[in-house]
């Protein structure tokens, strides 16, 4: 299941769609409710990622979200009729229900140490 998002003001805890072996973090988001506070906001950010989200390269991260996480995520939303919800395959659609409106890469954080990534040694999240 989804880890959800906790925003306690000074700290936010949420997930990430992919983590590369080089340490890059990647999200795809519908409205930016997860990505915006990670980039700027709370003094502390805790990110949870299961081993299923670890990929070799940035291209692998994008492919993972497009082929696995995106279609599975939109399928959980009843009433969404995007191409990926219907077929299970991303069609880079133009639907108003599109969940991949924001694509965010994070290479580093400022100030250093503000973001903590906790890797979970099991399949966790989409």
Language-model region placement:
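Active-site cofactor/substrate anionic-group-binding motifs, chiefly glycine-
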Residues: 1
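Conserved phosphate- and dinucleotide-binding cores of soluble alpha/beta proteins
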Residues: 6-126
